[in-house]
Curated annotation (Swiss-Prot):
Superkingdom of this protein's organism: Bacteria
Name of the featured protein: Large ribosomal subunit protein bL20
GO molecular function: rRNA binding; structural constituent of ribosome
GO BP annotations, alphabetical order: ribosomal large subunit assembly; translation
GO cellular component: ribonucleoprotein complex; ribosome
InterPro entries reported for this sequence: Ribosomal_bL20 (IPR005813), RIBOSOMAL_L20_CS (IPR049946), Ribosomal_protein_bL20_C (IPR035566)
Keyword rRNA-binding among record annotations: yes
Keywords: Ribonucleoprotein, Ribosomal protein, RNA-binding, rRNA-binding
Length: 115
């Protein structure tokens, strides 16, 4: 049986990593050893930030709802509590959108939340 040399496999692996590192600055896009580390780190950041994105958007929505509610003399917590008591189930994403784009609808919700 013939001996298998790994040149083809190594080249393919290197090409794959360098393709993933395309657009990186300097050696990070050209030197395999550096590019591999950069790609691994980028993957870790991407994994972490996919989870953080959910937290950040929720925080943004809450901030917008709070700002909208305070225009009607309500704090965020009292506004949400009032909606729950009135058995209105609108998620924070939609509430934030209403607070920014549809002031009249949000005002109606605030009136309901006040009791």
């Amino acid at each position: 049986m013939a001996r298998v040399k790994r040149g083809v496999i190594a080249r393919a692996r290197h090409k794959k990593v360098l393709k993933q590192a395309k657009g990186y600055y300097g050696a990070r896009s050209r030197v395999y050893r550096v590019a591999k580390q950069a790609v691994i780190k980028a993957g870790q950041y991407a994994y972490r930030d996919r989870r953080q994105r959910k937290r950040q958007f929720r925080a943004l929505w809450i901030t917008r709802i709070n700002a909208g509610a305070r225009e009607f003399g309500l704090s965020y917590s009292r506004f949400i509590s009032g909606l729950k008591k009135a058995s209105i189930e609108i998620d924070r994403k939609v509430l934030a959108d209403l607070a920014v784009r549809d002031k009249d609808a949000f005002a109606e919700l605030a009136r309901i939340a006040q009791g």
